[in-house]
């Protein structure tokens, strides 16, 4: 059905998962990045020094960035779930900032004036989907990492691959990705589709790992 193809009909929880999943390949799989990171005139590949700088910058202040996303998502939900006309929206944002941010907002802050997502018919009360989709996409990429040893990280087992045994494991998992997350569109509950692919419910473990935030405190 044309009404269920692409992102049509997909619940907001998973609308960004495919696009963010593609970003993980560029961010964390060397072969993928070097297949496209070439000079437009000389066709030379990205210098190794530049690649190493990209890796070092990848998770710079990542924890702060995730907190900022949690802050924006929470502000969005608070304003929509129980808004009272007499309550100052900026006061709501500042209260949330005190709960979540390491450095609370400045008294003169009017961040809502530039937070256009909350006034958008599509993303109003749905800004959280950016971060939640990142959890899902990181978990999905982690399956490929475990099967193909892309970064040397083991993100846990994947369900038994019943696809074509003549193909390498990564390609077989790719077939499953195509048949589930890509192929089923908005035709089924995305949570069930994700579980069909991953063999379990989503986990934030992969996102924390790739963000450099899974360090164990002694």
Predicted regions and their residues:
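Cation-handling catalytic/transport regions enriched in His/Asp/Glu
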Residues: 1-218
